[in-house]
UniProtKB/Swiss-Prot annotation:
This is Virion infectivity factor. It comes from Simian immunodeficiency virus agm.vervet (isolate AGM TYO-1) (SIV-agm.ver). A motif (BC-box-like motif) lies at residues 150-159. A motif (HCCH motif) lies at residues 112-142. The BC-like-box motif mediates the interaction with elongin BC complex. The modification Phosphothreonine is found at residue 100.
Length: 235
């Protein structure tokens, strides 16, 4: 007697096959570059999930992971064998295990917080020389929070807060000429938000593409550039 067929509904994004190929190339680059402990599974290693071409498992701390499922041949009854889609879900590893679907922006925000810093260490030295950075390495992770503050603004704000704390404790003498209540450092931080970058037309825009879920789901159609200045057309 044949068992009853059980259906599992997934939230997916229909994408072209060449976009998946390009995204996989970006993932392989970062796995080598950062030695990321992401796991990759081919379709023959996923015996129970039909139409799954491959899967990427991204550990998130000790208690969860993000599973990125790449589907193919979703409509064989109509002869559309080149139909591809992407599914993203969070899987909890706690005692009470559960799964939940993720949208690309939420997944990017989680991945950004665990694997990619906003700015490289080298950017701090460049900021001291006057370069302005308004985009982090993983800007897709800030979709829900808005634009990334400039590195100068973050550094000056931290410096100003440090001055205030030391002033309260009385361990250092008060800095001179702080200006208004906000302080000269605070006013300088505001000016840096809108100040143009000296010696360049772009503000930290040329970078190596990151393995963004928004990119994979087809939500971003833009030409990105690598560090060597050569264009990489995503779509």
């Amino acid at each position: 007697m044949n068992p009853n067929k059980e259906w599992v509904m997934r939230v997916t994004w229909k994408v072209p096959g060449d976009l998946i190929t390009k995204w996989q190339g970006i993932v392989r680059y970062w796995m080598r570059q950062r030695n990321l402990k992401w796991n990759y599974y081919m379709h023959y290693q996923i015996t129970w999930a039909w139409y799954t071409m491959s899967r990427y498992v991204i550990p998130i701390g000790k208690h969860g992971e993000i599973c990125v499922d790449l589907y193919w041949h979703l409509t064989p009854e109509q002869g559309w064998l080149s139909t591809y889609a992407v599914g993203i879900q969070y899987v909890s590893n706690l005692e009470s295990k559960y799964r939940t679907e993720l949208d690309p922006a939420t997944a990017d925000s989680i991945i950004h917080g665990h694997y990619f810093n906003c700015f490289k260490e080298r950017a701090i030295q460049q900021a001291l020389r006057g370069h302005r950075f308004v985009f982090c390495q993983f800007p897709e992770g800030h979709k829900s929070t808005g634009q990334v503050p400039s590195l100068q603004y973050l550094a000056l704000l931290a410096h100003q807060n440090g001055l205030r704390e030391r002033s309260k404790r009385g361990k250092t003498r008060r800095s001179r000429n702080l200006g208004s209540k906000q302080g000269a450092v605070g006013q300088m931080a505001k000016r840096y938000v809108t100040r143009s970058q000296p010696g360049g037309e772009a503000a930290f825009w040329e970078r190596t593409p990151v393995p963004s879920m928004e990119l994979l789901s087809g939500g971003r159609r833009k030409t990105w550039y690598s560090h060597d200045g050569k264009g990489l057309q995503i779509l």
